[in-house]
């Protein structure tokens, strides 16, 4: 997937979708209702919907859409995509390639790298390696490799590459929710 044509987060496409689009342009209302996830945020202001191996996906195995609760147009405020790996080194290799492209595209944006423990793994053996770009309009883009411990892999957790686009509105929600 080429990222170099985008100047604004709404110009980025993941599986043809962009921030600000209606999810109804890509999924039926039944699909949207059937794919609602349990809220993982401190409040339910935004709804999470995960879609696995959908017929129109060309690059990613899973796409995650977040929209405001009670938004009957399902306007996408956050859009994520994931690939799953048996070998974390494959994830790191693809992450590195994406970061090289993003470094060129967002050369004037603030960039941050963070390695942190996955809160679900109480042993502290699972990590996320995240590079985040802060765009001038308040939106953000993250490229993350999640490296689950062997014990979590055996429970069905797969190492994954995640590319996440967040509107300013969604980024502000997360900043307040987790401050």
Listing of model-derived features with the role each one plays in the protein:
Residues 4-11, 33-105, 109-179:
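Amphipathic N-proximal alpha-helical interface segments
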Residues 15-39:
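N-terminal targeting signals for Sec/Tat export/insertion, comprising classic cleavable signal peptides
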């Amino acid at each position: 997937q080429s990222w170099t044509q985008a100047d604004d987060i709404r110009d980025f496409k993941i599986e043809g979708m962009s921030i600000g689009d209606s999810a109804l342009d890509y999924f039926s209302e039944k699909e949207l209702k059937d794919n609602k996830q349990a809220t993982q945020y401190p409040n339910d202001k935004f709804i999470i919907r995960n879609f696995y191996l959908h017929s129109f996906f060309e690059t990613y195995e899973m796409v995650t859409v977040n929209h405001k609760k009670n938004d009957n147009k399902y306007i996408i405020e956050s859009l994520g995509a994931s690939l799953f790996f048996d070998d974390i080194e494959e994830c790191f290799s693809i992450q590195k390639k994406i970061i090289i492209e993003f470094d060129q595209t967002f050369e004037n944006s603030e960039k941050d790298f963070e390695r942190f423990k996955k809160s679900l793994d109480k042993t502290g053996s699972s990590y996320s390696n995240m590079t985040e770009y802060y765009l001038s309009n308040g939106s953000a883009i993250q490229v993350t490799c999640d490296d689950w411990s062997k014990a979590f892999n055996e429970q069905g957790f797969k190492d994954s590459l995640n590319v996440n686009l967040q509107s300013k509105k969604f980024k502000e929600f997360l900043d307040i929710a987790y401050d």
